[in-house]
Amino acid sequence: INDILDLSRIESGTMEFMFAEHNLPLLLKTVHDSQRLNMPPGVELVLRMPESDKKYLTTDNVRLQQVVNNLINNAAKFTSSGFITFGYEDDEVPGYTRIFVEDTGVGISEEGIRHIFERFYKVDNFTQGAGLGLSICQTIIERLNGTISVTSEVVKGTRFTVRLPNYCE
């Protein structure tokens, strides 16, 4: 239901974005604290960040948390054992940061990757959800002036990477 409401807000242009400067490590620690107890048995959630806790982004923290939570929830659906690792790293282009969520799950086929951000697309028919979450994530990240990409290897796992500018107007 929330995904359908978000999709409606996106399409009507009524989804609000509140840009402000936010401490990225604190934002990600908050996500970790709320998500770690939701992991399936045998799956460990790992937060990986540089030592400094002084990374700030001008972004909408509510929407960014929504995206990271969605990516972690998706990873948990397809990871029966192992790790879901998320965090951030500086991009090779100065002024940008990469936020990532990677898992040791079942992976996504090349065909699946081609369609993964399409509305209503689901990798299989057995998982919950309407197939809207990743499409909504992509739209939110674009509104945050960023990009989202995916790499995957079947049976080895998947990595979603969100690339955002440190500052935007």
What are these regions (language model features)?
Residues 18-33, 46, 65:
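A conserved beta-strand-to-alpha-helix junction within the catalytic ATP-binding
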Residues 38-48:
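Short conserved segments within the C-terminal catalytic ATPase subdomain
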Residues 75-76:
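Short helix-loop "hinge" at the ATP-lid/N-box region of the Bergerat-fold HATPase_c
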Residues 133, 137:
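Short alpha-helical Gxxx[C/S/T] motif in the catalytic ATP-binding
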Residues 108-120:
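Short conserved segment of the HATPase_c
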Residues 8-19:
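Helix-loop junction within the histidine kinase core
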